[in-house]
């Protein structure tokens, strides 16, 4: 079975959707190549699965350089930054996913590195220790985050580009599904089936590719009716999944607002997953309301549960 990496486009010409962003990126990349410099440090923020890692890879490929990938929670101390910088060559890309999770000491180390391309290190111990400034190759830091508000302001100010990746249009998702099916599977899918998958993907390419792979699995095993397939894998109207239904049921059982901590305890999920993976779509489509007192299901959310006989 294909992995998510195999679905990722490698160059701008292959990237579907986000036309304005692609147009601007093409201009910035062309200018950078003419100036023979490194691409400006870039911050990508938005929901998970909207193409942040893909764009980082594309920028590196378009520049003809290597892309070194790491996670923010792995960068806690200055030595973590030093070790990462020891791997790069001139104009390489460093991609830090969930960059908001870096430790404070790592953030502070990055500030001078991003501006001056040098790093201060301590050589020796105790009273014999001396600070030495080392130059590092010019490079591009690309940070990705689902929580822009947790990025320290001094770090955010050092990014030359800040791009927001919102949900994709349904037509863009349909085009992604069509292309990936043609390239990787060649399974018979009509327009109606592609539209159903696209409408269930919540505007997220990663989710669209996951649904496509599950549909392919069932089609190969003789299941032709896509609605039956969705029933089997528990995909409901609007693309809601089992964890969405469980979340809505928790709110349905409450007369008043309920707090995030209580929801997490009932569902046995971490608060971060709820805030970043479940709630945004439910809020956007008016299934729930969120305020300072907590979360409450809306009339639309109640109607959805009742119409689909999903009340637990």
Curated annotation (Swiss-Prot):
Residues 1-168 are annotated as: Large ATPase domain (RuvB-L). ATP binds at residues 8, 49, 52-54, 115-117, 158, 168, 206. Keywords: ATP-binding, Cytoplasm, DNA damage, DNA recombination, DNA repair, DNA-binding, Hydrolase, Nucleotide-binding. Residues 237-312 are annotated as: Head domain (RuvB-H). Residues 169-234 are annotated as: Small ATPAse domain (RuvB-S). It is found in: Cytoplasm. DNA binds at residues 290, 295. Mg(2+) binds at residue 53. GO terms for molecular function: ATP binding; ATP hydrolysis activity; four-way junction DNA binding; four-way junction helicase activity. Gene3D superfamilies: 1.10.8.60, P-loop containing nucleotide triphosphate hydrolases, Winged helix-like DNA-binding domain superfamily/Winged helix DNA-binding domain. The keyword Metal-binding does not apply. Belongs to the RuvB family. PANTHER family: HOLLIDAY JUNCTION BRANCH MIGRATION COMPLEX SUBUNIT RUVB, PTHR42848. Has 3 domains, the large (RuvB-L) and small ATPase (RuvB-S) domains and the C-terminal head (RuvB-H) domain. The head domain binds DNA, while the ATPase domains jointly bind ATP, ADP or are empty depending on the state of the subunit in the translocation cycle. During a single DNA translocation step the structure of each domain remains the same, but their relative positions change. The RuvA-RuvB-RuvC complex processes Holliday junction (HJ) DNA during genetic recombination and DNA repair, while the RuvA-RuvB complex plays an important role in the rescue of blocked DNA replication forks via replication fork reversal (RFR). RuvA specifically binds to HJ cruciform DNA, conferring on it an open structure. The RuvB hexamer acts as an ATP-dependent pump, pulling dsDNA into and through the RuvAB complex. RuvB forms 2 homohexamers on either side of HJ DNA bound by 1 or 2 RuvA tetramers; 4 subunits per hexamer contact DNA at a time. This is Holliday junction branch migration complex subunit RuvB. It comes from Ureaplasma urealyticum serovar 10 (strain ATCC 33699 / Western). The gene is ruvB.
């Amino acid at each position: 079975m294909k992995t998510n990496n195999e679905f990722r486009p490698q160059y701008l010409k292959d990237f579907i959707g986000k036309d304005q962003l692609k147009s601007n990126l093409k201009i910035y990349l062309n200018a950078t190549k003419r100036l023979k410099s490194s691409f400006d440090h870039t911050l990508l923020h938005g929901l998970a699965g909207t193409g942040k890692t893909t764009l980082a890879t594309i920028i590196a490929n378009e520049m003809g350089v290597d892309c070194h990938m790491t996670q923010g929670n792995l960068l806690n101390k200055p030595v973590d930054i030093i070790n990462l910088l020891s791997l790069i060559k001139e104009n390489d890309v460093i991609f830090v996913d969930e960059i908001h999770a870096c430790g404070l000491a790592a953030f502070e180390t990055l500030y001078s590195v991003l501006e001056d391309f040098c790093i201060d290190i301590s050589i020796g111990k105790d009273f014999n220790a001396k600070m030495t400034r080392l130059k590092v190759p010019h490079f591009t830091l690309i940070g990705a985050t689902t929580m822009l508000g947790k990025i320290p302001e001094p770090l955010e100010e050092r990014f030359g580009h800040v791009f927001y990746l919102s949900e994709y249009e349904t037509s863009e998702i349909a085009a992604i599904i069509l292309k990936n099916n043609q390239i990787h599977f060649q399974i018979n899918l009509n327009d109606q089936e592609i539209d159903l998958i696209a409408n269930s993907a919540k505007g997220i390419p990663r989710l669209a590719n996951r649904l496509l792979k599950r549909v392919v699995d069932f089609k190969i095993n003789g299941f032709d009716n896509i609605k039956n397939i969705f029933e089997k894998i528990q995909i409901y109207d609007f693309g809601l999944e089992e964890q969405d239904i469980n979340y809505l049921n928790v709110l349905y059982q409450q007369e008043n607002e309920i707090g995030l901590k209580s929801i997490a305890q009932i569902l046995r999920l971490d608060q971060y997953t709820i805030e970043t993976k479940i709630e945004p779509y439910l809020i956007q489509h008016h299934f729930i309301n969120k305020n300072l007192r907590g979360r409450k299901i809306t009339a639309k959310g109640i109607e959805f549960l009742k119409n689909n006989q999903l009340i637990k």
